[in-house]
Amino acid sequence: MVFAMLVVCWSIFLGLWMLVSRLKQSRDKICPPKGPPRLPWIGNLHQFPLKLLHLRLTEWSRTYGGFYTLKLGPVTAAVITDRQIAKEAFDRNSAISSTRHTNYATEFVTDGTHLLTMKYGALWREERKILQQTLKGSVCDNDHMRLIDAEQTQLMRDLLVNPSDYSAYIKRASTSIITSLVFGIRTPSCATLHLQELDAINDDWLQLLVIGGALSEDVFPVLKYIPSAFLGTFTKRLKGIRRRMRRLYGTMLNQTITRQRESPAPPARSMIDAVLNQREHFNLTDRQIEVLAGVTLEGGFDTTTSMLLVFVQAMTLHPECQERAYVEINALCGRHRIPQWSDRNQLPYVNMLLKETMRWRPVTTLSPPHVLEKDTTIRGTFLPQGSMLILNTWGLHQDPNVFIDPDRFDPMRYEGYTKLAADYANAPDAATRDHYTYGIGRRICPGIHLADRSMFLAIAKLIWGFRFEPQRDEQGNSIPIDSNPVTGYTVDKVQISPKPFACAVIPRDKEGEKTILREFGVASEVFADYNLDENASL
């Protein structure tokens, strides 16, 4: 219905737009297009799928190279599947390549204050600074690892109790880490109300970003002139997502404000505590604080959950990798101590395992498009102001010139890669970059330090405590696991995640079980620092 309405409106304005476009052509600098053939006026829009776009762009890169252009209506889009060109376009040209297009759907839902989709400017820099101060490496090491360790120890305890619900327990742990750090509010169980609501909102939001990306006002200029009432059920959907976001994030913000009034010096200080205590310095409205908190929740729980499920899938399919990692961990820790973050430098294979997990099935297959604020030329191709720059993360990770047999899961690709992802992202030589799952340029994921630490520790703990094996049917045969990126993964959202798969999570031994239960008792002392009000009204 929405698409049909857009087609009708597009037809109404097409004549005027064609006239304006012809007048502009006389001023535009023209260069031969390098990319798939395009049609007049619509360019490549008819070839632009809403599902599996990363596979289409990667397929084109095999034909047209690591840098080619598309035409999406009046907008030029440059697709980058080359490390050196990515470094040039997003890092060296970051002063002009860090903004976003105006997006009808996300503007409607968030009032233009969502950090992921917000245009580059003063507010973006202010909110980004808050996240960087909260999530930088030194703060993670000194302040956050205690909580992360405790939450992942509960994950191990939960898996002892009911291993068949491994997916739900992974989501709970990932959610509790981020809600605790953002609001000082834990997510103690899978039944916690805000977990269920956040999960539902995030699912709608990620699907909306796919549709919303197609509703850019720069790609469809007519959207600027269409009253929202004419978009019918789509507008109702946007209003519903907006209402639910405001209810959840606003409730959690109000809980934090109330707690501050009742206890001015809480044992554990959250990001929102810090923002509220420095309101005059940050100069943010309640609405901006609310959306900033929501951005952090959305980015922190779902991606980590999906990446840990990718890890579990990879271990189930590759027992030899799992066993090698276990031997390394057990040689260091034995059965009376669970791995800690401080063990990282002595666990090189676990580090390789993490990096290969991030490369093999990156949950973010394409970066949200950056937009040029000025005309520029990249590798001899002129790109006008307003052009999109799309980082093809999937294509970079599946490049056979960089990774031999790229679809094979092989942690040994990263032998000698001893640093964290942020170090390689900031390195001057693009050839040394480990992976692009966290993005690139000024808009690289601000949670890169937290996510890398959380993922490493979860992987080390899970391998120390459990074996991951295929489940068996009644005849004792292994139930196949589909890791195919087309059939085995979700494809209707901007992020991918494994579809449910049959995995047996088996505790390694009784001694390890005793250690997990003992360490969970210690973790419970950490949880006392956080608000456990899981029954607050939403």
Curated annotation (Swiss-Prot):
TM stretches of this protein: 2-21
Keyword Metal-binding: yes
Pathway: Secondary metabolite biosynthesis; terpenoid biosynthesis; Mycotoxin biosynthesis
Positions of disulphide bridges: none
GO annotation terms (biological process): mycotoxin biosynthetic process; terpenoid biosynthetic process
InterPro entries, per the entry: Cyt_P450, Cyt_P450_E_grp-I, Cyt_P450_sf, Cytochrome_P450_fung
Gene Ontology CC terms: membrane
Annotated keywords: Heme, Iron, Membrane, Metal-binding, Monooxygenase, Oxidoreductase, Transmembrane, Transmembrane helix
Binding-site residues for heme, renumbered to this chain: C445
A Pfam cross-reference name: p450
Subcellular location: Membrane
GO MF annotation, one: heme binding
Membrane-topology annotation of the record: Single-pass membrane protein
Class of the enzyme per the UniProt entry, highest EC level: oxidoreductase
Keyword Nucleotide-binding on entry: no
Function per UniProt: Cytochrome P450 monooxygenase; part of the gene cluster that mediates the biosynthesis of the neurotoxin verrucosidin, a methylated alpha-pyrone polyketide that inhibits oxidative phosphorylation in mitochondria and thereby causes neurological diseases. The carbon backbone of verrucosidin is synthesized by the HR-PKS verA, and further modified by the other verrucodidin cluster enzymes.
PANTHER family listed in its UniProt record: CYTOCHROME P450 MONOOXYGENASE ALNH-RELATED, P450, PUTATIVE (EUROFUNG)-RELATED-RELATED
Protein name stated in the entry: Cytochrome P450 monooxygenase verH
